[in-house]
Amino acid sequence: MNDAALAPDVSAALERGLQAQSLDTAFAAPLLRYLALLVRWNKTYNLTAVRDPRAMVTRHLLDSLAMQPYIASGMLADLGTGPGLPGIPLAITRPQLQVTLVESNGKKARFMREALRHLELRNARVAESRAEALDEPTAYDHLTARALDTLAGIIAVGGHLLRPGGSLLAMKGIYPHEEIAALPEGWTMSEVHQLQVPGLDGERHLVVVRKA
């Protein structure tokens, strides 16, 4: 399947969503190529439980991109990225970022390598590893995690990767009062942004945590 094989409403929904997020609709072309590849591989390898391409636009692409206004340039590690979410959409729309896609599942890592090759995406690489086993201490300005663990759990497995003063950006549903209260020593909640994801009902929050 190529992006031309996706139904026209999929492309239209993505373009509307990009406009709502104040992103250039020129990004629709590479995002659709990524989406088409994900749909094709998902039929065989079960990379995501979301199977409808139209739902993938909302729940994967636009949801991932909702955090991009809050990420500065630099080195970013996307922990437990699965098939590359949010890391690949962020790498597409933020070429000044250098993105490491951290994923231990071999099928998902192979898919991401193929996606990076297919998209000729030079500012991203795959690290086929568990986050806690990745030996790159203090190498990153930012960590992202979309559906990995509690804030404390994310810090436990990936906190060593972040430089002092760096930021963890974690996607959450409802405001995570208890998780924020349970942050370990040396980590402070910096900001919480309520996100508006085009087409997605329900609460979404981006929690930004700083490392001392």
Curated annotation (Swiss-Prot):
Subcellular location(s) of the protein: Cytoplasm
Entry keyword annotation includes Nucleotide-binding: no
Encoding gene, per UniProt annotation: rsmG
Recorded GO CC terms: cytosol
Family named by the database record: Belongs to the methyltransferase superfamily. RNA methyltransferase RsmG family.
GO MF terms, alphabetically ordered: rRNA (guanine-N7-)-methyltransferase activity
Protein name, UniProt field: Ribosomal RNA small subunit methyltransferase G
SUPFAM superfamilies, alphabetized: S-adenosyl-L-methionine-dependent methyltransferases
SS bond list: none
Key words of the record: Cytoplasm, Methyltransferase, rRNA processing, S-adenosyl-L-methionine, Transferase
HAMAP family: 16SrRNA_methyltr_G (MF_00074)
Keyword Transmembrane helix: no
Function as written in the Swiss-Prot or TrEMBL entry: Specifically methylates the N7 position of guanine in position 527 of 16S rRNA.
InterPro entries xrefs: rRNA_ssu_MeTfrase_G, SAM-dependent_MTases_sf
Lineage, opening ranks: Bacteria, Pseudomonadati, Pseudomonadota, Gammaproteobacteria, Lysobacterales
E.C. code: 2.1.1.170
Binding-site positions, S-adenosyl-L-methionine: 80, 85, 131-132, 146
Catalytic activity from the UniProt record: guanosine(527) in 16S rRNA + S-adenosyl-L-methionine = N(7)-methylguanosine(527) in 16S rRNA + S-adenosyl-L-homocysteine
